[in-house]
Amino acid sequence: MTWYVLLLLLVAAERLAELATARRNAAWSLARGGREYGRSHYPAIVALHAALLAGCAAEAVYRPFLPALGWTALAVVAAAQGLRWWCVLSLGPRWNTRVIVVPGLPLVAAGPYRLLRHPNYAAVVLEGLALPLVHTAWVTALGFTLLNAVLLRVRIRCENSALTYARTADPLLGLVR
């Protein structure tokens, strides 16, 4: 269990690094005329991700470590982290935990964005399911996955609307390769 708590602390530290990156990138985007969308649902996303970590820690106390499940889930968590940071690196200063669109910038179609429309959310789904299962916290995995599906539905609609608005506001926008 101690190593699992250390894993959760590492994931929490990674989340803090994400928030620092997002804060810096938000300043970059807003300084270039960026507009934020979906501000009202952002606190629910932050709360859900905090609850994921707390739920993992609390439920793992009552669950055994099952090696076949745990090691497989840990590999999925590592893959999800890799995908997430590939997204961050591919978007550069345009990556954010918030939906901020800078008018006049073309859509990014490099890195994982050439394969998936929303690869960062794929990483979130994978991690939200796998991280609890590393230590058999299936109630947390199920609860997070269901609540996350509701939030992602709102979030993806918001992001798609924002990106559509940005494209139609400037019909000359192309794709970054």
What do the PLM-derived regions correspond to, one by one?
Residues 8-23:
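N-terminal signal-anchor/start-transfer transmembrane helix
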Residues 9, 43-44, 50, 75, ...:
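A generic secondary-structure signal marking the coil-to-beta-strand transition
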Residues 40-69:
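Long, highly hydrophobic alpha-helical transmembrane signal-anchor segments
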